[in-house]
């Protein structure tokens, strides 16, 4: 769909309207933007408009027009939401804050939680993701934006597909679900 920016906006508006006509009364929550750093400045992946500074704000403005009664969600992958976390100086936090300050109606903040790591590096890399203090730091920071938080697209692998691996996977899931849902912003 690469073209000039106005052409891309026209096609996006058309798509928003089509989705709203068909689903606005049936699907309550809409992810307006998803993984806005993925493919950043990669011409083979992203459309021209995707790289514009007002992409997020413009997208939420259009979504608000088409879905006035639905909940609008911003979503980001695990790297920007969790691994690159620096409190209110995190790029995802600042992106949301900027959009809100510019009047975007963002009803919910969503973060993905994929643990796609090789088995031999899994324990080392995921230590930060499974750390209760880190989880609460992330959730506390995003809660300061005054929106509820959702965790989406969750992946906790069972590497060997054995009963033991599945038990470990289940224990991790129980622990992180308990941490997430004990937070008041969830």
Residue map of PLM features:
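Short loop/turn segments at strand-loop or loop-helix junctions that form parts
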Residues: 32-35, 76-77, 112-114, 152-155
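Structural recognition of alpha->loop->beta junctions
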Residues: 18-28, 95-108, 175-186
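Structural preference for beta-strand elements that scaffold enzyme active sites
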Residues: 27-31, 69-73, 105-110, 148-151, ...
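Aromatic-lined glycan-binding groove of carbohydrate-active enzymes
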Residues: 102-112, 138-155
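Active-site cleft segment of glycoside hydrolase catalytic domains centered on the general acid/base Glu
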Residues: 2-94, 119-137, 160-172
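Substrate-binding cleft of secreted/luminal carbohydrate-active enzymes
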Residues: 113-114, 150-154, 160, 167-186
